[in-house]
Amino acid sequence: MTFPGDTAVLVLAAGPGTRMRSDTPKVLHTLAGRSMLSHVLHAIAKLAPQRLIVVLGHDHQRIAPLVGELADTLGRTIDVALQDRPLGTGHAVLCGLSALPDDYAGNVVVTSGDTPLLDADTLADLIATHRAVSAAVTVLTTTLDDPFGYGRILRTQDHGVMAIVEQTDATPSQREIREVNAGVYAFDIAALRSALSRLSSNNAQQELYLTDVIAILRSDGQTVHASHVDDSALVAGVNNRVQLAQLASELNRRVVAAHQLAGVTVVDPATTWIDVDVTIGRDTVIHPGTQLLGRTQIGGRCVVGPDTTLTDVAVGDGASVVRTHGSSSSIGDGAAVGPFTYLRPGTALGADGKLGAFVEVKNSTIGTGTKVPHLTYVGDADIGEYSNIGASSVFVNYDGTSKRRTTVGSHVRTGSDTMFVAPVTIGDGAYTGAGTVVREDVPPGALAVSAGPQRNIENWVQRKRPGSPAAQASKRASEMACQQPTQPPDADQTP
């Protein structure tokens, strides 16, 4: 499914978006992991138009570099045209056409950069209808319960399109009309250029309205056609943050439903958020409160959630990830993570490994079958296969000026509360005792113990904390011990 070879597309993204009340350009606000402009350009690129032009104005210095990045991502050329003065949508189209050769002949599709749910099928149907009826212009329309802010479609008695009147110029009776302009058009370029040359700014906003082209072409006796879109969300625009949230919710509903229809169990779609670039394998179960963001990849037969957020994380088949926050990490097949686990960028957990409760890992590789069950920080480390890291262990990776790495071999067992002061290497099959501070390398098969014999300082509390609750308690315990009768030796025992 592609556009005909003589089709160019203009994307209007020059408006300031003042109703967003934001320092971020409107078209760069995101939903489902992409900016609004990115959603639109992805949809258009699927149809491979001959030319694709984005018209920028306000904050063009911030938007243009991102358009370049999207062009690289999509593997095609995207031209940028500049509207240096905000003189209306008609003027914006004139600026966009300046990027085309004067002798360009064909069709031009015009759409907006703030319609994030617009899809390739809708655009393909538009151009197919436009060509089938040989229209000078075909405009997409839809019907809204609340049409405030949209241009109204004025029809003739025989239901032909007579004109589009903007909200600010509409009469009270015209504002009652619920069929609105979706802001997506297909034009014959010669007819478009002719009509644009006759636009007037004699209106409430003193701008050149693209919508006035409809009445001009009709008065010329040319064919003006309208194609109604029943699913209004596909052509809904965003002017404020309320509408952004509404469309984000609607897009998420559609993304979640698509995964469900593909064989993924989503227990509670209302509390599950999945970005458009996320992939999930069959028979995976997603529990409530889960967010799968960026380019996260979930294998088949996994269990994810509840209360889990993964951003750009790759999860292998059959893995379990529960109450975990992770980013830019990988989890191997059959591995178990959580609950209350923090995976920072650069974490790689091998197949059948385990990262348990209150474990934080950063920039570390953890081998197949290795377990870090609980209460541990692993930073800048490489751990081999089938090792076990005891509770409350810490990989001490920062010396105050730089990060150092620790290497732990395979089949290693470390006691609780082991401190690995990097850089150190623990050989294969080595052990550490509880409370050990490892400052030097441990040879393979060795037991590292750093603590000396325990030493008890008698009556320390009475001397250092006299009168304290601890001193009083210890005094009572000593007195009770003194009152205990001493058992005489058993008469039958031989001295």
Swiss-Prot record:
According to the UniProt record, where is the region N-acetyltransferase?
Answer: 263-495
Q: Where is this region: Linker?
A: 242-262
Region of interest (Pyrophosphorylase), residue spans: 1-241
The EC number(s) this enzyme carries:
2.7.7.23, 2.3.1.157
Protein origin, superkingdom: Bacteria
Q: What positions does UniProt annotate as the active site of this protein?
A: H374
The UniProt annotation places Mg(2+) binding at D114, N239
How does the record describe its quaternary structure? Answer: Homotrimer.
**Protein name listed in UniProt:** Bifunctional protein GlmU
Q: Which organism does this sequence originate in?
A: Mycobacterium bovis (strain ATCC BAA-935 / AF2122/97)
What would be the name of the gene that encodes this protein? glmU
